[in-house]
Amino acid sequence: LCSLICYLIVCCPPTLTAQQQPREVVRILAVGNSFSDDGVEYLDELAKAAGIRLIVGNLYIGGCSLERHWENVSKGLPAYDYRKNCEGVQSNTPKTSLLSALQDEPWDYITVQQVSQNSGLYDTYYPFMPSLLQYLRTHATNPGVRFAIHQVWAYACDSNHSGFANYDNDQSRMYREIVKTVNRVSRKEHIPIVIPSGTAIQTGRNLMGDRMTRDGFHLDYGL
């Protein structure tokens, strides 16, 4: 998504001290699920077009909630597919722990997100988000790492996802609740960057119609 690369690379470049040279490579780690997989799908191509060298890691479990992320961390579970794109060279390491991926690179940015059906439900972020953020801050190897929260998109109007019922199967309501909740969490947890993927998709729907997903909730491969 254009919003991801714009906000993480163009709008929010890594902070450098007077002694540091500009980084040759920008490193982004997503602690997420299939929606983070969609969110980073075209980052490498966008980065190349912008003349930026990029390493992207995605800690992937389909449908993974913040509660499950924290359970994996607290129990040290090697539960993730660690999907990595290193300047166009892709790899996948199954049965990886969050700590292992976290310390694999000196990440410039780490993104977090709630599972899609709960993204607009504030209470589902707690107590897991503060604990997860503290763990990430403690164990990240780059002291200048910056954190971002991924504002995911609402489902298609005709989506059959069971979690759509949380919003009365109303796309507009789901979008509004996600935006409100993500902004509230980002302020409370002092997360400086909100990645507005949901707003980008909703704007696209307003312009081109509700044809943005391949199954009612995951993004279409042609986007």
Language-model features, listed with the residues they occupy:
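N-terminal module-boundary/linker segments of secreted carbohydrate-active enzymes
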Residues: 19-49
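A structural signal for isolated positions on well-ordered beta-strands in alpha/beta enzyme cores
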Residues: 27-29, 55-57, 146-148
